[in-house]
Amino acid sequence: MTTDVKDELSRLVVKSVSARRAEVTSLLRFAGGLHIVGGRVVVEAELDLGSIARRLRKEIFELYGYTAVVHVLSASGIRKSTRYVLRVANDGEALARQTGLLDMRGRPVRGLPAQVVGGSIDDAEAAWRGAFLAHGSLTEPGRSSALEVSCPGPEAALALVGAARRLGVGAKAREVRGADRVVVRDGEAIGALLTRMGAQDTRLVWEERRLRREVRATANRLANFDDANLRRSARAAVAAAARVERALEILGDTVPEHLASAGKLRVEHRQASLEELGRLADPPMTKDAVAGRIRRLLSMADRKAKVDGIPDTESVVTPDLLEDA
């Protein structure tokens, strides 16, 4: 689904000048580099979609007044797909300084510039958008689903992890076969980050496929149950997970950490027994401790829902939900 995300992001209209600058800086940092050609600094970026190259060329001209040239490298031999190389030669050094790729002394900045790292939330979203357009990937929902960005170095990876943290998304920097990557694996976090970047339509498709896969996996497990008690237990687990998801939604940031942890375990491992959830907890807990925390989480959410006059956790346990289980 990588192309879907990039296509949607390349058409996104951004009004904030600061965010547009942050996106350009991030795109250049993650997709390109600085070269010295004939004693001059040349800014270059290699991209995999023509729409991204056109967006970057347009933004460089509108924001900085410099002309970028795009060269098309057709697929052939070792190149599996067409690539687009954007190059700013005549004003390369000026652009590099203005985007923060070079510091005041003319030295290359290894991570992301301070104005992006310490910018607004819009800037953090733009930094992720630029990085994803440059070198991002999104796999289909499943056991190994992930949103990933290949990074030019560990400093850039850490800057991206920090930007994700500011957006409320947990991301991890990893070195895989000598290459630095930033990875988001949690399904909810992937969905949230897609929306933050501006790929809401793709998120909806991704979430639908994720839900369909979960339902299919649950159905496959249930098909193997030959005991009515196991089937009832599975329905109870589906209902409990749905109630917990609703509870976390109702409480938002006000949910105590220890209750949130137990709730997330229930949601992430829908078919696991309380005993199994206890073993998965860090540190491990007894099944009674897990059950107690989930009970308190649901009770707290239901009380808040009553005060706020909104649907409580029981409202999501519909006949259709149980029938699908």
UniProtKB/Swiss-Prot annotation:
GO terms for biological process: cell division; regulation of sporulation. Residues 273-306 bind DNA. One of its GO terms (molecular function) is DNA binding. Pfam families: HTH_WhiA (PF02650), LAGLIDADG_WhiA (PF14527), WhiA_N (PF10298). Keywords: Cell cycle, Cell division, DNA-binding. Belongs to the WhiA family. Involved in cell division and chromosome segregation. NCBIfam families: DNA_bind_WhiA. This is Probable cell division protein WhiA. It comes from Mycobacterium bovis (strain BCG / Tokyo 172 / ATCC 35737 / TMC 1019). The gene is whiA.
